[in-house]
Amino acid sequence: MRRVLAAVGLITMAGAGQAAGGHLERVLAAREIRVCIWPDYYGISYRNPKTQQLEGIDIDMARALARDLNVAVRFVDSSFAQLIGDVTQDRCDIAMFAIGITPQRSEKLHFTRPHLVSDIYAITTKSNRRIRTWDDIDKPGVVVAVAKGTLHEPIMRDKLRQATLLVTDTTQGREQEVESGRADVFMTDFPFSRRMLETTDWARLVAPAATYHLTPYAYAMQQGDSPWHERVEQFLADATRDGQLMAAIRRHKLDPIAAPTSASKN
C-alpha cells in the first residue's frame, strides 16, 4: 500500500504540466463549481433510480467543497471513457468520481491526493460453474469483460495470458455479457461490486486470494493550474483533519478501501 501511494506522488507531480488555468477565479466569479461525475458509480456518485437523487462519497465531498468555496455546485454527467475530454475541454472544473490514478491518465490530468485505494474484483453469475475462484479466471476458453475507458482495460490487457479479453463500449455492456453467459466474468472495483451484490439477484463476487492490483483513487483537474489544485488540496487537508472525509467514507460503507492518508492524525 505504501509503495502504491509513494508512486502516486511521482505521477501527480509529473501531471502538473502547462495548460489553461484560472479555474479558481472562474469558480469564485461565477459563484458555481462544475463537477464531473459518473452517475452509475454506486457509493461514489450514484443517481439513485428510485429517487433520481445523487448520492455517494464524492457527491458529499463535492457539496462540501462548494460550501468551502461559498459557491453553488453543478454536477455534469461524465464517464471514464469521456473523462479526459470533459476535463481538458473545460466541461467541468474538476472531476470527482473516485478516478483511478494511472500513468495514461496522468499524462493528461492533474490529480489530487488519493482518498480511496481499491483492488480489482470479478463478478460472475451464481450459475457459472467454470469460475469458482480467482485462479479459474485466466484459463483458456474463459471470456473476461471490461468496460472501455476504465482502468481495468489496460490492466487486464497486460495481465491476462490465456483468457480472452472482451472490451464493451459501456459498463452496462459488460454486465449484460456476463448475465447472458457470453462472458464469464467482468472486472470491477470494490464500490461497483457492492452495487452488483446489493441490487441484483444473479451476481456473485470472486475476490483475489491476495492483493492483485491496487489503484489509488482521487479527483482530477486540468494540468497547469496550480492555484486551483492547491485550493482543492487545502480543502482535502482540512476535511481530513476535521474528520469530514472519513465520516463520508464510512457513511457510504467504503472504509475497507479508505486510503491511509484519509484518516485524521489527531
Label the predicted regions.
Residues R113, T125-V142:
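Flexible hinge/capping segments at coil-to-helix
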Residues A81-G85, A98-E107, I155-D158, E179-H213:
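A ligand-binding cleft/hinge motif common to bilobed small-molecule-binding domains
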Residues G22, L151-L166, V206-A207, A237-N266:
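Ligand-binding clefts/hinges and TM-proximal coupling segments of bilobed small-molecule sensing domains
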Residues A30-I37, E55, D135-G149, T164-L165:
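Short loop->beta-strand "edge-of-pocket" segments that line small-molecule binding or catalytic clefts
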Residues A20-A98, E107, R251:
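Extracytoplasmic small-molecule ligand-binding "clamshell" domains
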Residues S45-T51, A62-V71, W134-D138, G149-T170, ...:
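Ligand-binding cleft/hinge of the Venus flytrap
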Residues I59-D60, R74-G85, R132, L166-S180, ...:
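Short helix-initiation/N-cap motifs at beta->coil->alpha
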Residues L116-T124, F190, R194-A237, D255-N266:
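Periplasmic-binding protein-like
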